[in-house]
């Protein structure tokens, strides 16, 4: 197992997606805190800025035409042409109210976009406040091909990563605050029903994705924190009080590099935990994951770099 860190020219390379056609085939895209969208060559030797969203790009996907679908925490759902750099705002509101924390997406074979809005109360700058207060205002949303946006699931504990099963018979959304991945059935006898793909995860899931191997890959951004768990279950007054103390005194995510993969039955297939001895740069807080042809690409909300694990 070889772990390689590839620097990019800005902080917070939060998610990754692998290009599949033309000049983008095999290249890895990521978005950074300064609004940049970067293309990284497959071997990591070249990094080019291809666009600027004017916001804070988080989750990345590819649409049916090979354009990037970008969840921008500030601007909502965007489409980006990687050849021209053109940025199109697709959706920024739900039921007449602006989104404040568009986070991650998955694109279906018919062009439907499933995506998450982590909170209706706090934006990305105050994600820790939402997490500790356990507001449960996260939502799974659906953008239909006619441009309409619908709420599919609400009252989620920090809705995060989104992925479709290989047969598209269900859609998943990571519930970071509950350490679960929620599954919503789309076809068959269970259509419309909701259950859990996996639960009691060893830490807090962030982005998820379906790999080229058909598995649902799940990031573990930080290990389970007993203090955070207690705070989330405590009185609302206490939870609010904690978010008002100086940031240096608040609970901090523990450093780790860990991703898991589950099959459609919710069986754990891979649990990849990179030891410190293989991570001399201290890369941490993996928030994006993409398995492609046996390589596992990663992004991080905190790092000015992406990483790849050759297994």
Identify the meaning behind each predicted range.
Residues 1-311:
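Sequence-structural signature of mature extracellular/luminal beta-sheet repeat domains
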């Amino acid at each position: 197992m070889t772990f390689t860190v590839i620097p990019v020219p800005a902080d917070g390379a939060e998610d990754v997606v692998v290009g599949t056609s033309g000049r983008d085939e095999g290249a890895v895209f990521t978005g950074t805190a300064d609004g940049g969208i970067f293309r990284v060559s497959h071997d990591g030797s070249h990094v080019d800025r291809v666009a600027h969203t004017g916001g804070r790009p988080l989750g990345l996907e590819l649409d049916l035409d090979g354009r990037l679908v970008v969840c921008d925490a500030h601007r909502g759902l965007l489409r980006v042409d990687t050849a021209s750099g053109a940025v199109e705002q697709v959706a920024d509101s739900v039921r007449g109210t602006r989104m404040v924390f568009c986070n991650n997406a998955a694109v279906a074979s018919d062009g439907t976009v499933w995506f998450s809005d982590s909170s209706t109360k706090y934006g990305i700058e105050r994600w820790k406040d939402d997490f500790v207060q356990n507001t449960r205002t996260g939502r799974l949303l659906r953008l239909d091909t006619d441009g309409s946006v619908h709420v599919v699931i609400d009252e989620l504990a920090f809705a995060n990563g989104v992925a479709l099963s290989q047969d598209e018979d269900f859609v998943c959304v990571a519930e970071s605050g509950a350490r679960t991945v929620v599954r919503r059935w789309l076809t068959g006898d269970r259509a419309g029903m909701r259950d859990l793909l996996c639960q009691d995860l060893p830490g807090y899931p962030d982005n998820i994705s379906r790999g080229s191997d058909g598995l649902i890959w799940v990031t573990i951004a930080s290990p389970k924190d007993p203090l955070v768990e207690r705070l989330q279950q405590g009185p609302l007054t206490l939870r609010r009080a904690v978010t008002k103390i100086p940031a240096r005194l608040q609970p901090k995510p523990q450093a780790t590099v860990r991703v898991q993969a589950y099959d459609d039955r919710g069986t754990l297939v891979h649990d990849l935990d990179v030891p410190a001895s293989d991570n001399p740069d201290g890369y941490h807080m993996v928030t994006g994951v993409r398995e492609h042809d046996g390589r596992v690409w990663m992004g991080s909300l905190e790092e000015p770099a992406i990483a790849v694990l050759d297994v």
